């Protein structure tokens, strides 16, 4: 009996040791903004600025598309994307804070958004299904990503071959909760993604950049940092 138990323990230990370790990614050579409240502004105030409508139009969001709202927070973009893609489309809303995810799930159920799913990711991996989305949206959140190379390495798996990753940021220093456009472009280029659209938004200092996968994903130890 002891021999069987010992053998089972050895097999379990060997299996644990055989599991591949998480790859090691280079650190960001820039500031990272602290995470702030997911309440960016009142929704009425944001609607008055009209940013969401402008962003969705520039990004080419259409009925029937599959889109992801990464770092969805309270779901401001989530619910508006759901309306545009319609019943034939799908929206995945992701956040890394369990309480925020739960509150967003409640909102989705309360507003009967049948085309929206909500999931929990991690700080460096949004856990997106592979090659599933026509558009991935990162809205006013990329400056808070602590491990951008790991995050982008995992993120790009979720976009379809002809899909776009759409970033909205403020053109100001990271410590002021913005992202200089040249830094954004460099970090995306390090993961094989190139910009195909850029625009300043009507709100003034905010900009949009849309990226497409242009090269194979490098292994973590081959990433050329900015």
How does the language model describe each region?
Residues 17-68, 76, 106:
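Class I SAM-dependent transferase core
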Residues 63-64, 87-88, 159-165:
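Short glycine-dipeptide loop
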Residues 124-136:
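A short acidic, Gly/Pro-enriched loop at the edge of an enzyme's catalytic core
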Residues 200-226:
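Core SAM-dependent methyltransferase catalytic element
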């Amino acid at each position: 009996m002891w021999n069987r138990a010992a053998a089972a323990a050895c097999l379990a230990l060997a299996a644990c040791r055989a599991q591949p370790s998480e790859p090691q990614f280079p650190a960001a050579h820039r500031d990272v903004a602290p995470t702030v409240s997911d309440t960016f502004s009142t929704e009425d105030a944001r609607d008055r600025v009209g940013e969401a409508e402008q962003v969705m139009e520039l990004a080419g969001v259409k009925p029937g598309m599959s889109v992801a709202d990464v770092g969805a927070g309270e779901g401001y973009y989530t619910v508006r994307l759901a309306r545009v893609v319609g019943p034939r489309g799908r929206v995945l809303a992701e956040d890394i804070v369990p309480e925020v995810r739960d509150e967003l799930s409640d909102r989705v159920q309360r507003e009967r958004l049948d085309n929206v799913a909500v999931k929990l990711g991690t700080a460096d991996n949004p856990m997106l299904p592979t090659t599933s989305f026509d558009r991935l949206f990162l809205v006013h959140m990329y400056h808070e990503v602590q491990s951008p190379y790991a995050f982008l390495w995992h993120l790009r798996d979720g976009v379809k071959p002809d899909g776009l990753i759409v970033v909205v940021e403020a053109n100001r220093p990271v410590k002021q909760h913005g992202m200089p456009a040249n830094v954004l472009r460099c970090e995306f280029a390090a993961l094989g993604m190139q910009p195909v659209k850029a625009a300043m938004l009507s709100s003034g200092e905010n900009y949009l950049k849309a990226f497409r996968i242009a090269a194979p994903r490098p292994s973590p130890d081959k990433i050329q940092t900015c």
